[in-house]
Design a protein with these regions (language model features):
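Non-catalytic scaffold segments within catalytic domains of secreted glycoside hydrolases
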Residues: 1-302
Length: 302
C-alpha cells in the first residue's frame, strides 16, 4: 500500500495501531500485560523495515478510546452495542491504562527514531469538551481524564494528531449525552463543525507542538451537508492558523463509506460502496469538491 501511494503521488500517513490487536495478545491480558510496551516495540521494529520512505507515522490511533474500550470489557449486556456512544459516556478511559499506552507510544517512538527519518506522533480523540455554567472544575477533571493525560505523553513528539468530530458539554456529573435532535449526524453526534477549531486552539495552547488533523468528518447521507460541515471546519481551521496555531495538514475521514461503530450504517465517505452488490465505488460530489479545496489550499474558504 505504501508503494502504491508513492506511485500515485499520495503521501502516506501510516498508523501502526488502530484499535485492532492480535487475538493472542488480547486473550493473554492485552494492554494490561507487563510486557505490553516491549511487545509493541518489537512489532514496530519488525514493520519499520518497510517504513524507510514514510514521512509521517502515528504510533497509536485514539489511545484514550483504546483505554475506554479496554475498560468496558465484559460490561455490555447481551444485545447491547459495546461501542455505542451512550456506553462510552457512562464511564471514561481506564486511568490504569493511560501510562501503559504512553509507554507503548514512547517505546515505538524510540524504535522509529533509530530506524527511520519519519515525523512521529500519536492521535488522541478530542471531544471539544465545554463546561456548562458553574461546572468549570468538573470540566477540568473530565478533560484531563479523557484527553489531558494523553497529551502529557506527547512531550518530545514531532506532531500531535487531532481527531475531531463533535463537541460535548460537561455538567456536574460529567459529559452530557447528545439528546435526540434532527441536526444530529448518523452516529447520533451533535452537528458541530466548529469543534475542530476548539480542539486545535486548545491543544496548541496546552502543548505548543505542531498539529496534524488526522481525522475530521461527518456521518451523513446528505452530501451537501458533508460539504457544509467540512467548509465550517476548515473555516475554523484557517482562523486558528491566522491566530498562530501551527497546523501541518488536514485529513478527511473517510475516503470510503465503511464499517463504522458496529455497522455500515454511518456513512462518512467521500465515495459510496455498493456492499449489497458488486462493491461498485461511486464518487460523491464532495470528493471533487474537497479535491478543489486541497488544490488551492482552501484559499476560497472564508
Amino acid at each position: 500500500m505504501i508503494d502504491c501511494c508513492h506511485q500515485h503521488g499520495v503521501l502516506p500517513i501510516v498508523t501502526l495501531h488502530h484499535f485492532t490487536s492480535p487475538r493472542w495478545f488480547s486473550e493473554s491480558g492485552g494492554l494490561r500485560r507487563a510486557d505490553a510496551a516491549a511487545l509493541f516495540a518489537a512489532y514496530v521494529e519488525f514493520v519499520s523495515e518497510i517504513l524507510h520512505d514514510v514521512e509521517w507515522i502515528v504510533t497509536i490511533n485514539e489511545p484514550n478510546i483504546a483505554a475506554l474500550f479496554a475498560g468496558m470489557h465484559d460490561k455490555p449486556a447481551e444485545g447491547e452495542d459495546p461501542i455505542s456512544v451512550q456506553m462510552a459516556l457512562a464511564g471514561g478511559p481506564d486511568p490504569e491504562l493511560a501510562p501503559i499506552l504512553a509507554a507503548m507510544h514512547h517505546a515505538a517512538r524510540d524504535v522509529l527514531r533509530a530506524r527511520t527519518n519519519a515525523k512521529i506522533g500519536w492521535a488522541p480523540a478530542t471531544q471539544a469538551f465545554m463546561p456548562t455554567e458553574g461546572n468549570e472544575a468538573k470540566w477540568q477533571e473530565v478533560f484531563y481524564a479523557w484527553e489531558g493525560v494523553f497529551f502529557d505523553a506527547t512531550e518530545g513528539d514531532d506532531f500531535i494528531g487531532i481527531q475531531s468530530y463533535t463537541s460535548q458539554p460537561v455538567d456536574a456529573n460529567g459529559p452530557v449525552p447528545h439528546p435526540p435532535h434532527p441536526d444530529n449526524t448518523l452516529t447520533g453526534w451533535a452537528y458541530r463543525p466548529d469543534a475542530l477549531a476548539i480542539n486545535l486552539r486548545r491543544v496548541w495552547e496546552l502543548k505548543g507542538i505542531p498539529l496534524l488533523v488526522t481525522e475530521n468528518g461527518i456521518a451523513t447521507d446528505d452530501d451537501n451537508r458533508r460539504i457544509a460541515y467540512v467548509t465550517g471546519a476548515l473555516s475554523g481551521l484557517k482562523s486558528a492558523v491566522g491566530d498562530g496555531v501551527e497546523v501541518l495538514g488536514y485529513c478527511y475521514w473517510s475516503l470510503l463509506d465503511n464499517y463504522e461503530w458496529g455497522s455500515y450504517g454511518p456513512t462518512f465517505g467521500l465515495i459510496s460502496v455498493d456492499r449489497a452488490g458488486d462493491f461498485t465505488r461511486t464518487p460523491k460530489p464532495s470528493l471533487a469538491w474537497l479535491g478543489e479545496v486541497a488544490a488551492d489550499n482552501a484559499d476560497h474558504i472564508d
